[in-house]
Amino acid sequence: MKEVILIKNGELALKGLNRRTFEDMLMANIRRRLASLGKFTCTPAQSTIIVEGPEDADLDEATERLLKVFGIAGLSRAAAVEKDMDVILNTCVEYTAPLLNAASTFKVEAKRADKKFPLNSPAICREVGGKILSKFHHLKVDVHNPDVIINVEVRDKCAFIHGNQLKGAGGMPSGSAGKAALLVSGGIDSPVAGWMMAKRGVELIAIHFASPPYTLSLIHI
């Protein structure tokens, strides 16, 4: 089992032939944001980006940093395992145990991108749900408003298992919409405007005029 971070890139999936250009910008921003934590790799796959770090990587800190990167709609810490149902079942119990121990209700969601996998999505949900109920007797199933959602994604090369998805900053990757200058005053309006522009992919150059003692002399007059 290898632990990775799954990035959901949101509205980038709506882009056409230039979608890969936006994904490349987002992956470059991710690598730059995590550079001080070690060498991380980014791999685009089926509307997601798989972020892998070195064995001793601090994934808690990496997750906190990525939540502030524009272009990321959501992310999850996930266990990457081989596409074997027994391995998937055991990993679901072991990897998500901290979440399940603290919860009262749960739900299983499965996505089977690899159609050659012997079980379909509803069957995967039944198998995983049954395994969890056999190990965590205090839990109940709630498909409408669960405390924890256990996700199983069967991809082409491996399967990913993760809990609730964390909401990211959203928007577009920084630098994808050119550059602009932001006049930063002493009020709240300019920082808010800057944040909204940055969320749409604008790379900002902040400008601030510090003019004392001239402004102070005008006030005294």
PLM segments and residue spans:
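Conserved small/polar residues in nucleotide/adenosyl-binding loops
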Residues: I219-I221
